[in-house]
Amino acid sequence: MILRIPSLLYLFTLLTAVYAVKFDLTSDRNPKPSIIWNFASAHSLVIVTANVPGEPDQQVDIQILDGSERGNVYLSKKDVRGEARLAVTTHESADVGVCLTNRYTGSGNPRVVRSVELDVDIGADAIDYNAIANQESLSILEVEMRKLEAVTKEIVEEMGYLQRREMRMRDTNESTNQRVKVFSVLIICCTIGLGVWQLLHLRSFFKRKYLID
């Protein structure tokens, strides 16, 4: 089957995702973090571009971490002003979070809002294919095929990660169900034992009162 260039570009557009958001970040003396989560495969390049306009008495801090069991913290940057471009490489397949806090350092009303623009490029989206094309003299079709190959690889890795996570959750559910079954059996045994003890106690009581032989 022949795949034409427009069809290839359309398919690539469907597979790629753009993680760009603009939101207001409220300052506080003890600010609560705002976290943007995106999935990233192991050993993936993650580029975070943050545009933070400079405002007096406000300090915006950025931290890049993941939601794995280890809780890896890849980068921390204090007092970000203007445009900041941060790049990290993930250690394992997990959700990667960009954590932002806006700390108020002045003496007046701490509830001040700052508008923040955040762009997160992961894996194939973070690679500069124009530079690769110039370096290796690739045609447009070859560049798009290279992009499509990288995106397909990421999809396969993400599906594998979801499958492994589903297996872990299933094992946890089975283990929990087994413990519940054992606990239920113990409860039933204790209930039966208590009932037998009460019957014996009542029988002994009635004998002492000469109500039964």
UniProtKB/Swiss-Prot annotation:
Cytoplasmic face of the membrane: 203-213
Location within or outside the cell: Endoplasmic reticulum membrane; Golgi apparatus membrane
Main location class: endoplasmic reticulum
Chain ranges passing through the membrane: 182-202
Signal peptide: 1-20
Keyword Transmembrane attached: yes
Positions of the GOLD domain: 33-122
GO cellular component terms given for this protein: COPII-coated ER to Golgi transport vesicle; endoplasmic reticulum membrane; Golgi membrane
Family, per entry: Belongs to the EMP24/GP25L family.
Membrane topology: Single-pass type I membrane protein
Residue numbers on the Lumenal membrane side: 21-181
Name used for this protein in its record: Endoplasmic reticulum vesicle protein 25
Function: Constituent of COPII-coated endoplasmic reticulum-derived transport vesicles. Required for efficient transport of a subset of secretory proteins to the Golgi. Facilitates retrograde transport from the Golgi to the endoplasmic reticulum.
Domain of life of the source: Eukaryota
Pfam families named among the record's database cross-references: EMP24_GP25L (PF01105)
Gene name in the database record: ERV25
Swiss-Prot/TrEMBL keywords: Endoplasmic reticulum, ER-Golgi transport, Golgi apparatus, Membrane, Protein transport, Signal, Transmembrane, Transmembrane helix, Transport
A Gene Ontology biological process term: protein transport
